């Protein structure tokens, strides 16, 4: 994906969160310069890969295949003594007409909770 597409997707997700009073953790608003300055108090964000993720699944058509998400909580199997969570908390945003391919995690539990919008789960063949 082009950086301009990623930036646009981030802005759309931020706008959706703001519109629906969904408050994001402070680290979602850090600039690259801020990340250079913060210390070990944010190691969990780095170690557990919390934050933004924008994907088109390598298909090159974000408006059709892909979504935007923010990982708020996550475990880390490589550091299970420090981060033992076996679940993740993520905010996912799919635009009208977007699809996400089926997938699963061997060692992660996910519950899908629709908080905003409508549920539209279907399998594409």
Tell what function each PLM region has.
Residues 1-87:
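A short, N-terminal "cap"/entry segment at the start of jelly-roll beta-barrel domains
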């Amino acid at each position: 994906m082009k950086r301009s597409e990623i930036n646009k997707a981030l802005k759309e997700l931020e706008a959706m969160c703001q519109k629906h009073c969904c408050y994001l953790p402070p680290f979602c608003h850090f600039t690259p310069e801020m990340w250079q300055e913060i210390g070990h108090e944010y190691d969990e964000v780095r170690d557990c890969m919390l934050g933004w993720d924008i994907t088109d699944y390598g298909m090159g058509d974000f408006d059709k295949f892909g979504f935007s998400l923010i990982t708020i909580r996550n475990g880390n199997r490589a550091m299970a003594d420090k981060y033992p969570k076996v679940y993740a908390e993520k905010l996912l945003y799919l635009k009208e007409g977007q699809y996400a391919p089926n997938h699963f995690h061997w060692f992660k539990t996910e519950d899908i909770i629709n908080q905003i919008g409508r549920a539209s789960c279907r399998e594409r063949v």
